[in-house]
């Protein structure tokens, strides 16, 4: 057993950890059987990465997993990121609920790691800690005028209409005629779709009451989605594009010039990209049939894709009090395939608008000074989920690989981290002896005046939300105030 541990240790993600003296047996190997009896593991974050990691860890017949969450409610971006008109995507909540109901899994909400309890304190209490807290921030534009009223991140806008407590004060001003979204990914299309969807089509979704009220008063008629590169480089997927093309009451605006010569180029691209580009090409260049032409002619709203444009400045209104447009540099592409990049041509153009939404990516934050963090890439440095130079510390999801991919991508990624952890456990590479787990953390939290929310507490809040939605035909009316949630629970 000792030699097996030794070989693995030499090739691990933790190469600069001090090795045991020659001929000695590390204590974590010596006590392997004790440790394996009841491994105590904690997961930080209850979104898809957290729950899928926990699900895999529970394959160990004795492992106990505690999931800590900053919000009083679970499910992360499934609750706060998935668009309200995509309820089918939220069905994964049923799987996560089954995991939470395991007798060896516990959810503890209303606990902010890094503030209420530190990562070193968690590492003292558990055999292993997995950081799965996602990407809570957005990438800044870093251009003049970004701070003007009328400019916000798509992430904050999504959080606002989905009931994320920290975004409920956003109050976006939708009194303008034109909105510009900087970015051409699925989040950008979600935001455009919500802005242009007739409000009555959202009435039976779980969009918040406040957001629906603001959208009913919206005067936004045109939404532009701006990208630095061309049609072959868009980041959205065909399902979301098809929804936009078929959006009731809205017509697409695509410039055929942007698609010149594209027919030959798409022959060599992978099939999903080819199908997506062909749909764009048809929409831009083919004359619609009579029914579609009539639908577009009667549309009161429009959306368009502006390619080969890079934002340089948010332009202020004459009084300087709010955003009134975006100055764009015209670009051209250099390089091939993955190395293709947009370079400015020297030409500029101004795009008037009253609302600017930045959708150029999410970004993770460092959670604790004791945890390594690559601020440039926005991830925790790791090898297959093992945090570099910190034995017993792991990561999964967006904080592990960056904010890309769909829920299925996160599932695969999280299962891999769980697999690595269980391998290390079996090899005796984690701390030996019993660990107190939640009992120790509960005492710390109690001494600090923090009252965790259990999964059964969440189910009471869930029932309250469903009951509030029934009167208006909604699946639920989300609670958006953490203090109200805690009051309802008697905390």
Curated annotation (Swiss-Prot):
It is an enzyme of class 1 (oxidoreductase). Pfam families: NAD_binding_8. One of its GO terms (molecular function) is ferredoxin-NADP+ reductase activity. Gene3D superfamilies: FAD/NAD(P)-binding domain, NAD(P)-binding Rossmann-like Domain. NADP(+) binds at residues 184-187, 228-229, 240, 405. It comes from Homo sapiens (Human). Changing residue 158 to M: In MMDS9B; uncertain significance. It is found in: Mitochondrion; Mitochondrion inner membrane. This is NADPH:adrenodoxin oxidoreductase, mitochondrial. Changing residue 193 to C: In MMDS9B; uncertain significance. The modification Phosphoserine is found at residues 310, 317. Changing residue 448 to Q: In MMDS9B; uncertain significance. It is linked to Auditory neuropathy and optic atrophy: An autosomal recessive disease characterized by hearing loss, visual impairment and optic atrophy, with onset in the first or second decades of life. Optic atrophy is caused by degeneration of nerve fibers which arise in the retina and converge to form the optic disk, optic nerve, optic chiasm and optic tracts. Multiple mitochondrial dysfunctions syndrome 9B: An autosomal recessive disorder characterized by optic and/or auditory neuropathy with onset in the first two decades of life, in some cases associated with developmental delay or regression, global hypotonia, pyramidal, cerebellar signs, and seizures.
